């Protein structure tokens, strides 16, 4: 079996885990003999630029390049550039569709990790206290800004009411605060825009007859 490098990989990362995302994307690409043009989110460019300075002392020139900017300009240029052989994106579904369209024009390879929320299925014989403990930790990790956040829960009829009550109590006990407050469990969201977006989901849910908000429901200042 012969394995050849793909060539130039354009990697586009989100803002929720900027340093880890960069490491995850660079490692396999470089190990496979490729070069990488990396675009961090315009909201979190500093970690990528710092790591680029460190890599400049280790890797040959041109193996890793970092270009900061917005998706509409820098991102669009990368995915449409004829010199790019592969696109790697971690982002939302709408952006993924645009990338597939762009990649099809020049037959680029693609690697897409698109957004979603992890479902949790709880059967009637489950240990409710253990489930609640896990949900309290992993539903709100990184302020819930995680595509694997356990935010969708499907529970059996027999334990449904108990699970809702216990999970409501657990969620109500979470400490919210500033990012530099060592006592907090959840810090602020990445931006005002994201805060407004999350608040809109709650407001939309509140208008549905079958939805009951059991705790919270109001944005914090």
Which residues does each predicted region cover?
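Rossmann-like NAD(P) dinucleotide-binding subdomain of oxidoreductase/dehydrogenase enzymes
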Residues: 1-130
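ALDH superfamily catalytic-core signature
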Residues: 59, 86, 92-221
């Amino acid at each position: 079996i012969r394995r050849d490098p793909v060539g130039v990989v354009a990697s586009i990362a989100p803002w929720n885990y900027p340093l880890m995302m960069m490491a995850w994307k660079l490692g396999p690409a470089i190990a496979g003999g490729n070069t990488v043009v990396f675009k961090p989110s315009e909201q979190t460019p500093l970690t990528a630029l710092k790591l680029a300075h460190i890599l400049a002392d280790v890797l040959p020139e041109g193996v890793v390049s970092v270009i900061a900017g917005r998706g509409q300009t820098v991102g669009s240029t990368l995915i449409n550039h004829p010199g790019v052989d592969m696109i790697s994106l971690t982002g939302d579904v709408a952006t993924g569709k645009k990338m597939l369209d762009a990649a099809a024009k020049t037959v680029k390879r693609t690697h897409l990790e698109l957004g979603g929320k992890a479902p949790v299925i709880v059967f009637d014989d489950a240990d409710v206290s253990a489930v609640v403990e896990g949900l309290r930790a992993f539903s709100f990790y990184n302020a819930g800004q995680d595509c694997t956040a356990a935010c969708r829960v499907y529970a059996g009829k027999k334990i449904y009411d108990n699970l809702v009550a216990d999970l409501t109590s657990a969620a109500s006990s979470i400490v919210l605060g500033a990012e530099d407050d060592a006592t907090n469990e959840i810090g602020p969201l990445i931006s005002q825009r994201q805060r407004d977006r999350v608040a809109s989901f709650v407001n939309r849910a509140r208008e549905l007859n079958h939805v009951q908000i059991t705790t919270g429901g109001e944005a914090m200042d």
